[in-house]
A protein has these predicted regions:
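Short hydrophobic/aromatic-rich motifs at helix boundaries and adjacent loops
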Residues: 16-21, 77-78, 142-147
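Contiguous beta-strand/loop segments that form the cofactor/metal-binding neighborhood of enzyme cores
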Residues: 44-129, 133
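C-terminal glycine/acidic-rich active-site capping loop/insertion
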Residues: 110-166
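Short beta->alpha junction loops/turns
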Residues: 41, 98-100, 164-166
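Domain-wide signal for the mature, well-folded portions of proteins, strongly enriched
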Residues: 1-4, 10-15, 31-32, 55, ...
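Predominantly a Rossmann-like dinucleotide-binding segment in NAD(P)-dependent oxidoreductases
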Residues: 1-73
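Exposed boundary/loop context
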Residues: 26-31, 76, 104, 145, ...
């Protein structure tokens, strides 16, 4: 139990090869007009909304960091995008999705009791098993001396998935 959620952060992306922007449908405005947001970002959004019990955000902002060149008369599409969602009670979520950065598919849930880290929240690294760390760090303050001590444990869960071998 992480306690009440204060912030969620997630990232899903991969580095497309040198021909990606020119040849892949994900970078073609007529075939995937939302680019990395439509292909990858929705995983981050759904994770955040699921963790927040489907609560609607109060407001949402986003920024395109990089976009494709227009192709064959079609508009450009986002190649790198970040977003922010604000929820009632002061909770928030941020995410980044990209076709132009090293592969990443992590999520972090910060609560007032603990931190939950998931390094493979979209595609399990091994078969149908996802792992997460539940971290309960302790901040020790003695007058002007302070120390941060990490405490936590790794958990594994079976995930029904079509990605599982066999």
């Amino acid at each position: 139990d992480v306690g009440p959620i204060r912030h969620l952060a997630s990232q899903f992306g991969f580095m497309g090869d040198e021909d990606f922007e020119r040849t892949n449908i994900r970078a073609h405005g007529a075939l995937e007009p939302l680019g990395c947001l439509g292909d990858l970002g929705w995983y981050c959004l759904r994770f955040s909304l699921w963790a927040m019990n489907e609560a609607a955000p109060l407001y949402v902002t986003g920024r395109i960091h990089q976009e494709s060149a227009p192709r064959e008369g079609s508009p450009s599409v986002p190649l790198a995008f970040s977003g922010f969602l604000a929820f009632a009670g002061g909770s928030s979520a941020s995410f980044y999705c990209s076709f132009t950065a090293a592969h990443a598919q992590w999520a972090v849930v910060s609560g007032d009791k603990a931190l939950l880290q998931v390094s493979d929240f979209v595609l399990p690294f091994s078969g149908a098993e996802s792992k997460f760390n539940l971290i309960r760090s302790e901040f020790i303050l003695d007058r002007c001396q302070f120390d941060m001590q990490e405490g936590g444990h790794l958990e594994s869960v079976e995930e029904p998935s079509s990605n599982a071998p066999g």
